[in-house]
Amino acid sequence: MAKNSNKVKKNTNKANNFKLLADNRYAKFQYAISETIEAGIELLGTEVKSIRNGKANLRDGYCSFRDGEILLLNVHISPHKNVGSFFNHDPLRNRKLLLHKKEIIKMKSNTEKKGMTIVPLSLYLKGSWIKLTIGVGKGKKLHDKRQDEKQKSIKKEINSALKR
């Protein structure tokens, strides 16, 4: 007979804990996202502190290929306020994304098509790791945006009519 048979096991899997730190809603409006992928990101200590405080802006960010790596460009992470200026980071520095070689090759082949680009979609905590969701998308034209707005309004009307 086991002594600990009446104890209930708690779910201690930290990988299931997600906390959204920054979201790029503008990219979802500007681009038709065809594929998404989760990537790690190489950060400095002060950048981690700033991101955990919600001081990251993904709106103008994009990804580029250099020397067989994917770099995250033009993402603003504010300097940490409690650190001296000597130890702080550059807010707009290029950050390396951590992906497998096969994923990098797949992303590169997808972006070689005309009009395709890689944009950051969201930044979140997965356990104790900061992860970035990037998407391959094609820029929407004005008529595509109008069509999406019409679809949203029609869907909203249908849902409100069904609730009555």
Swiss-Prot record:
Subcellular location, record wording: Cytoplasm
One Pfam family here: SmpB
Gene Ontology biological-process entries: trans-translation
Keywords, comma-separated and alphabetical: Cytoplasm, RNA-binding
Sequence ranges of Basic and acidic residues compositional bias: 145-158
Sequence segments annotated as region (Disordered): 141-164
Major localisation: cytoplasm
Domain of life assignment: Bacteria
Gene Ontology cellular-component annotations: cytosol
GO molecular function, one term: RNA binding
Family: Belongs to the SmpB family.
NCBIfam families according to UniProt: PRK05422.1, smpB
Function: Required for rescue of stalled ribosomes mediated by trans-translation. Binds to transfer-messenger RNA (tmRNA), required for stable association of tmRNA with ribosomes. tmRNA and SmpB together mimic tRNA shape, replacing the anticodon stem-loop with SmpB. tmRNA is encoded by the ssrA gene; the 2 termini fold to resemble tRNA(Ala) and it encodes a 'tag peptide', a short internal open reading frame. During trans-translation Ala-aminoacylated tmRNA acts like a tRNA, entering the A-site of stalled ribosomes, displacing the stalled mRNA.
Protein name: SsrA-binding protein
Record organism: Prochlorococcus marinus (strain AS9601)
The gene coding this protein: smpB
